[in-house]
């Protein structure tokens, strides 16, 4: 579905693209030749008439004469992408980006080519860079790019970021089996390239969970809750199903319901730290004494996990165990050197145990990092996202 959608929207953006290329015929050097202008016009006419093979040959001829014709490289790239000639399309979009580095739409298309060519790291980097630069005001193209970003993040195990990307699609009204399959894998923390077959129990669970997650992403929480409860009634022991439901209930601001589901996941998987970390994080402000046990258990189960030490340090600090909090927070700071909350928490703990010089250094470090954040215009990544790719399933 999304592949067909992309083919459609690429045809639609060829007009507004001229505003982004800044490479029209009158601007490019060496275009005084009337023959070259005529050749470029013929290439565009063949493209618009659907004579794609002819258009491709004409674009190649024109670009051999004028290799700085940005719009020509774009048109050639889209033709080759639509023909599933991704390696050639990649080269064309690389030319566009080289000639106009701020061309966000071409950067997005380059990322889509890299996705098809099995270059996930490069694809994700270019797609995310395209979002910073800006993609043309074409919602269909934006949806395709956002979906592929979600897939790449899911396969990389960056489930929280993938959830945010896919939720934006659901909030915009997009629904499909393809989207549900990917979102189901995100919610159940599966890094598989494709969801299980729909003829299997696992495949059906993934689809149901994906639909529920999409409803939650669209803020239709009652409908999402109904979908989750239906699938849990049928397969209550499916791995991370209760965890996924707990995350949905957190989004719906149902604190008690979320804790109940995380505890149910612990009962199903006693050695899994994820639900313990979620409870510890959720109880930090609500009931730190209750959350403390779950953070302690998480650290015992997986002592190499820095996030466990971070949450344990915060909960110890909140419950007045300042001396015990310090080594936990210091361990976390080594793993998350840019996280300002660790510095201010350590400053508090140092002050409470009579270490004013250490407290002053921690506050100074906090101020320095905040100044860097303001200068860059970017804040540090939310630390609870460190659950992704840092905890054993």
Residue ranges and their predicted role:
Residues 36, 70-71, 104-105, 138-139, ...:
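Helix-start (N-cap) detector for alpha-helical repeat units in TPR-like alpha-solenoids
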Residues 34-65, 82, 204-226, 230:
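Alpha-helical segment of the N-proximal tetratricopeptide repeat
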């Amino acid at each position: 579905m999304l592949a067909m959608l992309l083919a459609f929207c690429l045809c639609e953006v060829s007009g507004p693209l001229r505003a982004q290329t800044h490479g029209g015929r009158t601007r490019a050097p060496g275009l005084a030749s009337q023959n070259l202008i005529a050749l470029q016009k013929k290439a565009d006419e063949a493209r618009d008439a659907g004579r794609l093979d002819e258009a491709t040959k004409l674009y190649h001829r024109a670009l051999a004469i004028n290799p700085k014709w940005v719009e020509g490289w774009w048109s050639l790239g889209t033709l080759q992408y639509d023909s599933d000639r991704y390696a050639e399309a990649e080269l064309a979009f690389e030319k566009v980006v080289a000639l106009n580095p701020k061309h966000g739409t071409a950067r997005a298309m380059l990322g889509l080519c890299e996705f098809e060519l099995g270059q996930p790291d490069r694809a994700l980097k270019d797609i995310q860079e395209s979002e910073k630069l800006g993609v043309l005001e074409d919602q269909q193209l934006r949806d395709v790019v956002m979906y592929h970003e979600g897939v790449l993040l899911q396969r990389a195990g960056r489930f929280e970021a993938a959830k945010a990307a896919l939720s934006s699609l659901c909030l915009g009204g997009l629904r499909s089996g393809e989207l549900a399959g990917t979102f189901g894998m995100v919610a159940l923390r599966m890094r598989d390239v494709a969801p299980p077959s729909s003829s299997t129990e696992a495949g059906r669970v993934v689809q149901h969970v994906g639909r529920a997650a999409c409803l939650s992403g669209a803020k239709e929480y009652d409908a999402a809750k109904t979908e989750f409860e239906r699938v849990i009634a049928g397969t209550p022991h499916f791995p991370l199903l209760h965890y996924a439901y707990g995350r949905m209930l957190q989004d719906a601001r149902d604190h008690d319901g979320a804790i109940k589901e995380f505890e149910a996941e612990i009962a199903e998987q006693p050695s899994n730290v994820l639900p313990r970390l979620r409870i510890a994080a959720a109880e930090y402000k609500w009931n730190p004494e209750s959350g403390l046990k779950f953070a302690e258990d998480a650290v015992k189960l997986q002592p190499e996990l820095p996030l466990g030490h971070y949450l344990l340090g915060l909960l110890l600090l909140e419950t007045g165990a300042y001396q015990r909090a310090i080594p936990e927070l210091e361990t976390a700071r080594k793993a998350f050197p840019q996280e300002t909350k660790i510095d201010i928490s350590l400053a508090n703990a140092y002050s409470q145990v009579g270490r004013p010089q250490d407290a002053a250094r921690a506050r100074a470090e906090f101020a320095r990092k905040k100044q860097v954040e303001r200068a860059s215009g970017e804040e540090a990544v939310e630390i609870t996202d460190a659950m992704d790719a840092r905890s054993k399933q």
